[in-house]
Design a protein with these regions (language model features):
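An N-terminal, well-structured beta->alpha segment
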Residues: 4-101, 190-191, 195-225, 236
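Glycine-rich phosphate-binding loop plus the immediately following alpha-helix
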Residues: 154-184, 322-345, 350-361, 416
């Protein structure tokens, strides 16, 4: 079957010469042909993501057209404004794919609002809500290597598409011929017919106003003289992040020159992920040279941010996603209580794999902490639930350990722009009282205990990878460990058993160990990986590290 598909693509007058050249190059290579054509990229709640190239199992204009026709078929059943918002990041062909999506939607009589330049995830979520769109499309593969691109789909609330809607769209995609099934008009024709319009300045400024409304101490940064190094990692964060920081009074910003401008090849770091040291290396070097108070880096679609803080001895320390989440929660709570802006019955939300230290901080400030499944859409779902009750002002912060944060209800996905603003405001505040981010983190550990959170990832590439991952999860379910690394397992929670958790079904296993440590195992939702999350608690960092190493040494052989 896949050889027939390859032959058809080879004989079809493809509009992208790169694809034609690739097909010629793989002639006779059955393994490569099978990898590209035996399956298709599957559309889920996170949309599509795959390697760029020719074939149904790759990201290209034909896969994008097919996906958009499926989305269009769904939109046409939804009533409303019959409108879709579109944005894109700096990745290879992101702008091409965004325009292709617009052309298919317009050919289906669906109006499009598309950004005239690359803009990040929060801008797409905001535009979807601002224009009361039926859906949104963000062309990005987030922090994946340069050879990847993707297509995130959003519902009318600006949150990633629900399971039910994604299933309908996927069925429509499957019934659409990949090469000839999508309707299409030219981008210019769509503009001329008034079906395609650019996002207006009113929407763009509305986003900035909404972000600035999340300040805890407005005006503080204008007198704090904060010195900052920032890297957009060749992505979409440069304009929105520097704009918002300038607006709140931070002008001393040094941009990492090699990573300043959009470049989908990501020449300085093969994996543009702010969780990874290599992505932050140039920024750290520049921070040390300039004596900056803080270094920030946002990923290509600017929905996640990583930071390094200056220590009293002049060195710099990377801050984990869990630590930033806890620091922001502590800062927002203390600041809003001080300023009298804390809502009644405040709510914060975190993913279940994020640190329990956040629960302790929330309890201290009288904040209800809700833990949800991994994936920011579940945090967005909690905001939507509050909004439906007329209580959206109760939401003060949502975060994931994977460096995603949101501090207001104006969008329904993680936002590195508001996170960058609040991180800088927090650093400026501690500087103004003779303290520092580092000192406050140590005070939090002293008050609540030395929690350590680490994640190990195990890759399973290729067509067989998904089967291997499924086999490992099945083995763990049928052979639950009684002990891990010498620590007795006192509780096992299987999130596929919804009657136990009260949450939607998820492929997640949680092991509670004697002494309070936890191990969580789950497959990644976006990459061919299984992740193991370790939380340990010790009298000091050395003890917590030792326990983590004992646990990971015992568990790692299962993933080999």
């Amino acid at each position: 079957m896949y050889m027939n598909d390859y032959k058809r693509w080879n004989e079809f007058p493809l509009e992208d010469s790169d694809l034609t050249a690739e097909l010629a190059k793989i002639a006779g290579d059955e393994a490569e042909i099978k990898d590209r054509f035996a399956v298709s990229l599957k559309f889920g709640t996170a949309g599509l993501r795959g390697v760029l190239g020719a074939g149904s199992n790759r990201m290209n204009i034909y896969v994008v057209r097919q996906a958009t026709q499926g989305l269009a078929n769904w939109v046409k059943t939804q009533g409303g404004n019959q409108l879709v918002a579109i944005s894109y990041d700096s990745r290879i062909k992101s702008d091409v794919f965004a325009k292709e999506a617009a052309c298919v939607l317009a050919a289906n009589g669906i109006k499009v609002r598309i950004y005239d330049a690359l803009m990040p995830v929060p801008a797409l979520s905001f535009a979807t809500r601002y224009y009361k769109a039926n859906a949104g499309i963000m062309v990005t593969a987030s922090h994946n290597p340069a050879k990847y691109n993707g297509y995130k789909a959003y519902g009318p609330d600006g949150c990633q598409m629900t399971d039910d809607a994604a299933a309908v769209v996927y069925a429509e995609i499957q019934s659409t011929d990949i090469l000839e099934g999508a309707k299409r008009i030219s981008f210019e024709e769509g503009i001329a017919q008034g079906l395609i319009e650019y996002v207006g300045d009113d929407c763009k400024e509305g986003l900035y106003d909404a972000i600035k409304a999340c300040q805890v101490r407005p005006g503080l940064c204008k007198t704090a003289s904060l010195k900052l190094v920032y890297s957009p990692l060749n992505g979409s964060g440069l304009v929105p992040v520097t704009r918002i920081l300038n607006d709140i009074g931070i002008d001393d910003i040094t941009i990492v020159p090699e990573q300043k401008y959009p470049d989908g090849n990501f020449p300085t770091c093969p994996y543009p992920n702010p969780e990874i040291f290599e992505a932050l290396r140039l920024g750290l070097e520049l921070a040390k040279q300039s004596g900056a108070d803080l270094m920030l880096a946002t990923d290509p679609d600017a929905d996640r941010v990583g930071i390094a803080m200056k220590c009293p001895d002049g060195s710099y320390e990377l801050v984990s996603g869990n630590e930033v989440g806890v620091l922001l929660l502590d800062y927002i709570c203390a600041g809003r209580i001080e300023k009298g802006t804390m809502p009644a019955n405040p709510v914060a939300v975190k993913s279940l794999v994020s640190t329990p230290l956040a629960d302790a901080v929330a309890a201290h400030y009288g904040v209800e902490m809700r833990s949800v499944l991994t994936g920011f859409k579940w945090i967005g779902d909690q905001i939507a639930g509050l909004e439906a009750k007329g209580e959206v002002e109760r939401f003060i912060l949502g975060f994931e350990e994977s460096y995603g944060y949101l501090a207001g209800p104006y969008v329904r996905d993680k936002d590195a722009v508001v996170a960058s603003m609040l991180i800088c405001e927090m650093a400026a505040y501690y500087r103004s009282i003779g303290s520092s981010v580092k000192q406050r983190m140590e005070e939090i550990y002293a008050q609540y205990g030395r929690y350590l959170n680490k994640v190990d990832s195990f890759e399973f590439p290729g067509l067989s990878g998904m089967d291997k991952m499924a086999g490992i999860m099945a083995f763990l379910r049928s052979n639950p460990p009684h002990a891990i690394g010498g620590y007795d397992v006192v509780k096992v929670t299987d999130y596929q058993k919804t009657e136990e958790t009260g949450l939607p079904s998820a492929n997640v296993l949680v092991y509670g160990l004697e002494g309070g440590a936890t191990v969580i195992v789950r497959p990644s939702g976006t990459e061919p990986k299984i992740k193991a999350y370790y939380t340990t608690l010790g009298k000091d960092i050395a003890e917590a590290e030792e326990q983590k190493n004992e646990l990971s040494d015992a568990l790692t052989p299962l993933f080999s």
